[in-house]
Swiss-Prot record:
Keywords for this protein: Capsid protein, Eukaryotic host gene expression shutoff by virus, Eukaryotic host translation shutoff by virus, Helical capsid protein, Host gene expression shutoff by virus, Host-virus interaction, Ribonucleoprotein, RNA-binding, Viral nucleoprotein, Virion
Subcellular location per the Swiss-Prot or TrEMBL entry: Virion
GO cellular component annotations of the record: helical viral capsid; ribonucleoprotein complex; viral nucleocapsid
Main location: virion
Gene Ontology BP term (one): symbiont-mediated suppression of host gene expression
Protein name: Nucleoprotein
Annotated residues for binding of RNA: 18, 47, 50, 75-76, 81, 94, 124, 126, 129, 167, 177, 183-185
Similarity-based family: Belongs to the orthobunyavirus nucleocapsid protein family.
Protein's gene: N
Molecular function via GO: RNA binding
Length: 235
């Protein structure tokens, strides 16, 4: 009869994970140690960190970004991908979303223009920049290009979702990558609720995304003006 006895197993997903609670716990633990310099280094090296972790079998790792060290669950190594992730665990993806929200809050809570300028010159979003989107498009839009921001659809005004929708429509991204955003809450609304109640807000957000100067990454406005003198007009 032993072959008919079954036991519960740990979930391999993050079912029941509350991003807002996770973010608050992150802030409590790291508020005194995290700073703009460390966040800049993280975002510029997140892809490299993922690649390095994919070669290490350890379940947890302690990458260091400048002087800031943080423990993360290593779900990038092929043999670790089905390991359970607890609600209070950090992954590179969660860390990306948390730090993007932290930067946005730092930016919005500081009315001092010199402080805001420091944030804008320190924090670089390589994904946004490669698509020609910069800080002057708006803090929420610029930061929404960071992975993990889809956990906070209300905070980022649906931009993580609508940026994804635009990229799918333009053939820049596979539709499967929208799944994470489509499972998230919007404030207290579950996905099935906001999909029916927030259509107008999502359409407005998408329209703003469509009006961005996409595809202008890599060349400054000065360089573009120079090329125009020789009859070369870039999109």
């Amino acid at each position: 009869m032993s072959d008919l006895v079954f036991y519960d197993v740990a979930s391999t997903g993050a079912n029941g994970f509350d991003p807002d609670a996770g973010y608050m716990a992150f802030c409590v633990k790291y508020a005194e140690s995290v700073n703009l310099a460390a966040v800049r280094i993280f975002f510029l090296n997140a892809a490299k960190a993922k690649a390095a972790l994919s070669r290490k079998p350890e379940r947890k790792a302690n990458p260091k970004f400048g002087e800031w060290q943080v423990e993360v669950v290593n779900n990038h190594f092929p043999g670790n991908r089905n390991n359970p992730i607890n609600s209070d665990d950090l992954t590179i993806h969660r860390l990306s979303g948390y730090l993007a929200r932290w930067v946005l809050e730092q930016y919005k809570e500081n009315e001092d223009e010199s402080r805001r300028e420091l944030i804008k010159t320190t924090i670089i979003n390589p994904i946004a920049e490669s698509n020609g989107v910069r800080w002057d498009s708006g803090a929420e839009i610029y930061l929404s290009f960071f992975p993990g921001t889809e956990m906070f659809l209300e905070t980022f005004k649906f931009y993580p979702l609508t940026i994804g929708i635009y990229r799918v429509k333009q053939g820049m991204m596979d539709p499967q990558y929208l799944k994470k955003a489509l499972r998230q809450r919007y404030g207290s609304l579950t996905a099935d609720k906001w999909m029916s109640q927030k259509v107008t807000a999502i359409a407005k957000s998408l329209k703003e995304v469509e009006q961005l100067k996409w595809g202008r990454g890599g060349l400054s406005d000065t360089a573009r003006s120079f090329l125009q003198k020789f009859g070369i007009r870039l999109p």
